[in-house]
Amino acid sequence: MTRTSPTLPVIILGAGMVGLTLAQALKKAGIPYEVYERDSAADTEKGRGWALTVHWALNALEECLPAELFNRLEEIQVDPTLDDSRRFCFLDLSTAIPKYVIPPSKRLRVNRRLLGNLLGEGLDINYNKTLSSFHVSPETPDSVTVTFTDGTSTTGCLLVGTDGRNSKTRRLLLGEEAGALNPLPVRSIGTTITMTPEQFAPIREIDPLLFQGSHPETGVYMWFSLVSSPTINGSKDTPNPFYEGQLIQSWLYKSEKDAVPETDADRLALFKNNAQHFQRRLREAIETLPEDSKVLHIKLVDWVPVDWDNRGGRVTLAGDAAHAMTSYRGEAFNHGVADAAMLSRNIIAAWTNPGMTGGIADAPDSPIVSKRAKIAREARDARARAKLSEIAV
């Protein structure tokens, strides 16, 4: 923002976790913002599945959020009864014995749907708004105009694309080829498992929250994490309390025989077949998956960031739009929060410091590009190393 356009808002495209975090930071600082989301409110909430871990970015998230929201994060943990400063285990799936243990550190494993709802509290979000184009005019270089497919438009001092891994903002910024996602030679499927306390007990013995591992002979990788517990899913005081977990498997794609089946039934059969040689507790948990289970084909892709033309400092990217990465390191959300914190600091500095003659245009993209490029490559390599070595989470 320059001094000639002090009231133009920051335009945030995408009401995902990172976009909402940035919006909260700007609102907290009294800086005008507008959030636009492609999907409807109902579809946006429906798309927030499973859970995520906030670890090294906890301080950055606290910086972005008002205290009353940050203090409620512990309430939306997948199991608020746990002190989540536990170790993180990478198992030999044939024995369920840890091969590698990452030391305990402060972290919060939170339900994604509840986190999205919390981050959206008090924000004005414009739904059903799909990006068509953006334009920075030579006549008005201190602003950017965004046009949507419904024919409406808006003008702001900065456009931040937080529209996910398949970001339209990124593809418009760099072109379709340079902005396209990179498919990886790995196949992955995932499902939700619902368990009674008795069914969950054997898994809880391994770890009550999350673990991952690989089988030394088949190379099949598996991730388990708790998604909800009776305390947060409303079943605590009912006759049938239950736990929900997230199960993901992946394997290297070498030929067509490694392809993911087309139907839920066939994917479920493959999920169970892959677990045949897992340690008994893991195998039996997977064998109990009901025949009508929905098993998702998770398409693993990434995008390693490169320098982009930020249109004179008026257009930038954050979160998955800036550095789509695989989930093996468990860091994507944390890097997105770090992006939001860094951008909000720069925006606040430009907004409050008349000495920054370029205003928002002075805010650098380089930390996002250089550091996140390294991390995206490491996340890509983590799956290839999973069979033999530790994954640093």
Curated annotation (Swiss-Prot):
Induction profile: Deletion of the conserved eukaryotic csnE deneddylase subunit of the COP9 signalosome leading to defect in protein degradation results in the activation of the silenced dba gene cluster. Expression is positively regulated by the dba cluster specific transcription factor dbaA. Expression is also controlled by the transcription factor flbB.
Signal peptide: 1-23
UniProt KW keywords: FAD, Flavoprotein, Glycoprotein, Monooxygenase, Oxidoreductase, Signal
Domain of life: Eukaryota
Required cofactor(s): FAD
Enzyme Commission code: 1.-.-.-
Stretches of the chain forming a coiled coil according to its record: none
Pfam families in UniProt: FAD_binding_3 (PF01494)
Positions glycosylated per UniProt: 128, 233
MF-aspect GO terms: FAD binding; monooxygenase activity
Residue sites binding FAD per the record: 37, 107, 320
GO biological process, any: secondary metabolite biosynthetic process
Pathway given in the UniProt record: Secondary metabolite biosynthesis
Consequences of knocking out this gene: Does not lead to any phenotypic changes.
Active site (catalytic residues): 221
Stored PANTHER family: FAD-BINDING DOMAIN-CONTAINING PROTEIN-RELATED (PTHR47178:SF1), MONOOXYGENASE, FAD-BINDING (PTHR47178)
Family to which this protein belongs: Belongs to the paxM FAD-dependent monooxygenase family.
Function field: FAD-dependent monooxygenase; part of the gene cluster that mediates the biosynthesis of the antibiotic 2,4-dihydroxy-3-methyl-6-(2-oxopropyl)benzaldehyde (DHMBA) and its derivatives. The direct non-reducing polyketide synthase dbaI product is 2,4-dihydroxy-3-methyl-6-(2-oxopropyl)benzaldehyde (DHMBA), produced by condensation of one acetyl-CoA starter unit with 4 malonyl-CoA units and one methylation step. The FAD-dependent monooxygenase dbaH is responsible for the synthesis of yellow pigments derived from the oxidation of DHMBA. The roles of dbaB, C, E and F have still to be determined.
Name of the featured protein: FAD-dependent monooxygenase dbaB
